[in-house]
Amino acid sequence: HEKIKILDIFRHENKLRIGHLKGNNFFIRLKKVSKPAAKILENVLRTIDKNGFANYFGYQRFGKFGDNARVGEEILRGKNSIKNPKLRDFFISAYQSEIFNRWLSRRVEISKFAHEFNKKEFAKIYPNLSEIYGDLRSENGIFSIIRGDVMGHYPFGKCFLCENLGDEQVRFAKRDIVPTGIIAGAKTLFCDGICGQIEREFLPDDEILAKMNGSRRFAWCYLENLKFNYDEENAHFMMSFYLPKGSYATVVLEEILHTRLRDYAPNLAE
């Protein structure tokens, strides 16, 4: 493609395989940005750089028409037959991604409501979570971890259950660990307690779970090496940052712009 530039080519003694990638460097240029808007962008980027962001799967994961997840579920339930194994796995992966995104949206909402409403108001929205209201409010961040959460060492490392909430809150604040969300399937570590109840709301029945390979994915992520600059003469706002593998720059853009990029997808490459 004429808009793709290959910066360098070199040999390596090992072949590149799935899992070898550590992360990606991104450069993004926004056009027609006014000076006041650039100031807002700078402040939003500083906030994201400080607090991190919810590590959703980007809209690209779900296909041009946003129906890949539906096709994946149909395959698992025997309502759609696709013989190509790679294509079949692709659609099932989109279904797993949708489950993760829905769960993550709920957890972000729970954390937000715990800080915006008093205990009585919160209990009306989430009566089964009223007993952990104090724990949810004990954190200053945007995402509150819960006893029974499956935590992961960040940016690489094993997963474990959160048992000592106070200690893990400190480690989360230091970016040593982050909460993880489930990639639905068999043979994975599930959340425990109330946290597990929330997780199970989004999971299919055991028969469907057994047909998928499960794992965990970081629910929270951080920008690295963030740089940004405003070119007032051309009204361009440039930013660059690094993300670990599996994280989407488009998700960061949606967080910055507070809009769904899917609505603008045909014009993003222009």
Feature-to-residue mapping (PLM):
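Non-catalytic, substrate/partner-engaging modules appended to enzymatic cores
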Residues: 1-270
